């Protein structure tokens, strides 16, 4: 059977459920897919157990269990990621295996914010999830409305602590389980038929309006990491790689950033699969012919970018997940002063880990396999670094950690 064509009639947004274990993330995900199936043939409703048996994925050699579902609202098409285990969230958010343009934080009205609620919020902040909408679940288990209001206040305070806009964020109370049961009983339930199903509609209306449509990759400033370089006699030097974002046209001025002093050059030709192009866009694997650049002045690990859009750095702070030995990581802890390779985009750069910081701000002296930690890194060579950039930490050819840049220092 022929594959269905992916119809791009609505803007696409990546979203995920986050929150403490057993607060109802997967149940809510199931309820959303069932309620939203009225808007589309896309993403027929998924039952709880279809979501919970999440397949394993490998991102940078790390095994992550994530479940992907899709659904549509009146205004948008969503790809929704739900992770069964807490460790999966940590790995997913740090490796960016499933990018999130926004998140639904699920908090049980019976318990209020718990340790993982806070840990997921901290991670969401540091990996750059821009906006969050809250679903206050298990409302049916709270008899007293005042208690629910207290929990809501506590949630808003917690959001403020992690620099999300606690006053402004929509918080929708409801019961994912009762909504799901109502939808299983009458899958045709529309808005106004059932108070619990209405909570799901209300949640998604808030997600539609509060979580911004992400800027498309093609609208961002041009960037391509250089993978290979060769010279064509009589024509000049060609740098090849995959365009990470933006658009590049013949005649554009671009900057070569990283490893050496930043220089400017002009694009004189573009080729893809032996054909010439006038312009190349995000996602293309392309060869870029550059004017007046010697082959020895470009090397793998540099980037070609729109002038002024990215600069070379050597010092940054990052949130890192350290692989367990079962995942192929180290068997032993490491300490400040450890000098592994940092694999960024297309190249390894040696760097020194100067210090580690725990979530509460205290300095830790040692990092164990399986830990998540904030670290201060100094690279021996400057490379193009920006906030939110992902990297892997390697040692002797194997990945021992994955990280995301949270702050640039120098």
From Swiss-Prot:
Keyword Ribonucleoprotein appears in the UniProt entry: no
Coiled coil: none
G4, as annotated region: 137-140
CDD domains documented for this protein: EF_Tu, EFTU_II, EFTU_III
Ranges for region G5: 175-177
InterPro entries: EF-Tu_GTP-bd, EF-Tu_GTPase, EFTu-like_2, EFTU_2, G_TR_CS, P-loop_NTPase, Small_GTP-bd, T_Tr_GTP-bd_dom
Alphabetical UniProt keywords: Chloroplast, Elongation factor, GTP-binding, Hydrolase, Magnesium, Metal-binding, Nucleotide-binding, Plastid, Protein biosynthesis
Domain (tr-type G) ranges: 10-215
Binding positions for GTP per the UniProt entry: 19-26, 82-86, 137-140
GO biological process per UniProt: mitochondrial translational elongation
EC number of the protein: 3.6.5.3
Region named G3: 82-85
Pfam families linked: GTP_EFTU, GTP_EFTU_D2, GTP_EFTU_D3
Major place of residence: plastid
Region (G2): 61-65
Reaction catalysed by this enzyme: GTP + H2O = GDP + phosphate + H(+)
GO molecular function: GTP binding; GTPase activity; translation elongation factor activity
GO cellular component: chloroplast; mitochondrion
Positions of the UniProt region annotated as G1: 19-26
Membrane spanning residue stretches: none
Compartment list: Plastid, Chloroplast
Binding site for Mg(2+): 26
Family membership noted in the UniProt record: Belongs to the TRAFAC class translation factor GTPase superfamily. Classic translation factor GTPase family. EF-Tu/EF-1A subfamily.
Function: GTP hydrolase that promotes the GTP-dependent binding of aminoacyl-tRNA to the A-site of ribosomes during protein biosynthesis.
Protein name: Elongation factor Tu, chloroplastic
Biological source species: Oltmannsiellopsis viridis
């Amino acid at each position: 059977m022929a594959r269905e064509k992916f119809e791009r009639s609505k803007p696409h947004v990546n979203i995920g459920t986050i929150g403490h274990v057993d607060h109802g993330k997967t149940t809510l995900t199931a309820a959303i897919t069932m309620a939203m199936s009225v808007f589309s043939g896309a993403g027929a409703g998924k039952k709880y157990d279809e979501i919970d048996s999440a397949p394993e994925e490998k991102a940078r050699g790390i095994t992550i269990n994530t479940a992907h579902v899709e659904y549509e609202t009146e205004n948008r098409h969503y790809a929704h990621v739900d992770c069964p285990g807490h460790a999966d969230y940590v790995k997913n958010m740090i490796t960016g295996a499933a990018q999130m343009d926004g998140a639904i934080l699920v908090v049980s009205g019976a318990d209020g914010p718990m340790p993982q609620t806070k840990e997921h919020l901290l991670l969401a902040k540091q990996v750059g999830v821009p906006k969050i909408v809250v679903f206050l679940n298990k409302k049916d288990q709270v008899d007293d409305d005042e208690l629910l209001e207290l929990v809501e206040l506590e949630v808003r305070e917690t959001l403020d602590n992690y620099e999300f806009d606690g006053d402004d964020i929509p918080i929708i109370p409801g019961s994912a389980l009762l909504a799901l049961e109502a939808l299983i009983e009458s899958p045709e339930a529309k808005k106004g038929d059932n108070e619990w199903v209405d909570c799901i509609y209300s949640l998604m209306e808030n997600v539609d309006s509060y979580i911004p449509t992400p800027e498309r990759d093609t609208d961002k400033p041009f960037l391509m990491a250089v993978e290979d370089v060769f010279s064509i006699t009589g024509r000049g030097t060609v740098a090849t790689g995959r365009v990470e974002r933006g658009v590049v046209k013949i005649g554009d001025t671009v900057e070569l950033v990283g490893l050496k002093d930043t220089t400017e050059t002009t694009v004189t030709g573009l080729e893809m699969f032996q054909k010439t192009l006038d312009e190349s866009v995000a996602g293309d694997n392309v060869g870029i012919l550059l004017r007046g650049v010697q082959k020895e002045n470009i090397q793998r690990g540099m980037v070609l970018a729109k002038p002024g859009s990215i600069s070379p750095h050597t010092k940054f702070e990052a949130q890192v997940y350290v692989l367990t030995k079962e995942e192929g990581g180290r068997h032993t802890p490491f300490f400040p002063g450890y000098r592994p390779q940092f694999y960024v985009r297309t190249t390894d750069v040696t760097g020194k880990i100067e210090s580690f910081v725990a979530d509460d701000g205290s300095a830790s002296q040692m990092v164990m396999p399986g830990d998540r930690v904030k670290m201060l890194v100094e690279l021996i060579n400057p490379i193009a670094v920006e906030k939110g950039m992902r990297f892997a930490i390697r040692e002797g050819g194997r990945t021992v950690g994955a990280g995301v840049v949270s702050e640039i220092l120098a």
